[in-house]
């Protein structure tokens, strides 16, 4: 009886388990809304409020912008993050505390891209050394841009000590927010860029470290498709499942801004051909990655 009550109290977790499966397989998609497929489950819940901007009636405040990031801009932003941002020592990555990372033109990405994937990167302390290939494909999970979120304190430090926010990403996201919402003075101040491979997941959570939770969160999807779950402020209510594609934008405003959300499944073999260049290293990476840019304004405008 106790187990049954616990399951009832965490319906969200049951839905996460429903869609999580072996990395190389695809789960039952019969109850997944695909914004790009009018025949998909629950498509009628999407309402176009502006050109290519859709509200989702089951998650008040959630906006879905289909194919909003052009293929050219996707490539530009992906190259910027890999060739410029991760080699900047001011931008933290999940690897930074554990490895003696080479930076600048000798970064792990540039070594990988230039065919030196078998070179060894030494660990710090008791961390074992690993090859560049393994670090790039398996171990690199995130990088922070702009104001550097402190994962230990769950806070943003003094903004005066943070690196500047990347202009290309900031300009685009601010334009998207102004075109799609009433937040005309919203500023891109911080971002977490997540790198997912098939088999990776993001558990249910609410983003609540920012000072003003009425300000929207913006998510850009690139690379592999994913299943995205969006619920309410309670884990006891069943979330909706959506399939997000490369180039889609999700904006969380209103009630959805404080809703539990998760990514239980990365869909293999779904990277669009326009992100492939013919370069073996690049194609081998992007064909097995979902890159998610999650951008936010940290504190109210003053």
Swiss-Prot record:
It catalyses: an N(1)-methyladenosine in tRNA + 2-oxoglutarate + O2 = an adenosine in tRNA + formaldehyde + succinate + CO2; N(1)-methyladenosine(58) in tRNA + 2-oxoglutarate + O2 = adenosine(58) in tRNA + formaldehyde + succinate + CO2. This is tRNA demethylase abh1. It is found in: Cytoplasm; Nucleus. Its cofactor is Fe(2+). Residues 187-299 form the Fe2OG dioxygenase domain. Pfam families: 2OG-FeII_Oxy_2. Belongs to the alkB family. The keyword Cell cycle does not apply. GO terms for cellular component: cytoplasm; cytosol; nucleus. Disruption phenotype: No sensitivity to methyl methanesulfonate (MMS). The lineage of its organism: Eukaryota, Fungi, Dikarya, Ascomycota, Taphrinomycotina. Keywords: Cytoplasm, Dioxygenase, Iron, Metal-binding, Nucleus, Oxidoreductase, Translation regulation. 2-oxoglutarate binds at residues 194-196, 290-296. InterPro entries: Alkb, AlkB-like, AlkB-like_sf, Oxoglu/Fe-dep_dioxygenase_dom.
